């Protein structure tokens, strides 16, 4: 994924009301950015960090600038735009960069499924193969080199795991992909210290046939690419 036009840089002043962030550009201009992340953003929104933002061509948007990346004072890059996790995963599947998800010729997005009427991020299909249901989660919470999900209690995430267990029980392929969008993370675990129920459900899901995968994105202000498998400890 190439950023075109190129991202612009600024210095973070504060994030507030979850969806907004005040920044100062290198020439001293004050801007308010849209923050496309409803999570806690622990370690991703420290005042003084460098932020990289995109600008929409839609002139009707109240906040035309979108916060895409944080470059921390320690040199780590973090993608804070949660929409990018799905885009990067879709691109990686289509370009056959994820061997575990190769061999399908049809990719559908936002398909309704399950007893709780959820929407799956992606469904892959191919002749003579069971349908493959994929749920994608964005991982940005880091403690040293350890990456964790979620960064806050997520009942929605718990529901998705229950739905995937149902998919696996019905004979289909069920997969949860943790897209690691933090350059300092080298391994992944569920955040048992934040959402114990999610961690327990993830272990249960794996035991019932749900595949748990984690891939790390190469991040820069110029491009992003999901391709590197990350070790998982449940």
Curated annotation (Swiss-Prot):
Family: Belongs to the SfsA family.
UniProt keyword list: DNA-binding
Entry-linked HAMAP family: SfsA
Official protein name in the record: Sugar fermentation stimulation protein A
Function per UniProt: Binds to DNA non-specifically. Could be a regulatory factor involved in maltose metabolism.
Native organism: Salmonella gallinarum (strain 287/91 / NCTC 13346)
Gene3D superfamilies: 2.40.50.580, 3.40.1350.60
DNA-binding region: 201-220
GO molecular function: DNA binding
């Amino acid at each position: 994924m190439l950023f075109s036009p190129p991202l612009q840089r600024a210095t973070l002043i504060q994030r507030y009301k979850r969806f907004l962030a005040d920044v100062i550009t290198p020439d001293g201009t004050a801007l308010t950015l849209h923050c496309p992340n409803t999570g806690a953003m622990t370690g991703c929104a420290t005042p003084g960090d460098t932020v990289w933002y995109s600008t929409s061509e839609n002139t009707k948007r109240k906040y035309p600038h979108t916060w895409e990346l944080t470059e921390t004072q320690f040199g780590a890059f973090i993608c804070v735009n949660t929409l990018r996790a799905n885009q990067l995963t879709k691109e990686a599947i289509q370009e056959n960069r994820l061997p575990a998800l190769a061999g399908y010729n049809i990719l559908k997005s936002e398909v309704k499924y399950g007893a709780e009427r959820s929407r799956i991020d992606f469904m892959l299909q191919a002749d003579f193969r069971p349908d493959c249901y994929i749920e994608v989660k964005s991982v940005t919470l880091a403690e040293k080199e350890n990456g964790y999900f979620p960064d806050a209690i997520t009942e929605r995430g718990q529901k998705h795991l229950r739905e995937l267990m149902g998919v696996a029980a019905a004979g289909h392929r069920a997969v949860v992909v943790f897209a690691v969008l933090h350059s300092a993370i080298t391994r992944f675990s569920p955040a048992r210290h934040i959402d114990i129920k999610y961690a327990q459900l993830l272990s249960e899901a794996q035991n019932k046939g749900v595949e748990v995968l984690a891939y790390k994105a190469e991040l820069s202000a110029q491009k992003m690419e999901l391709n590197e498998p990350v070790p998982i400890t449940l």
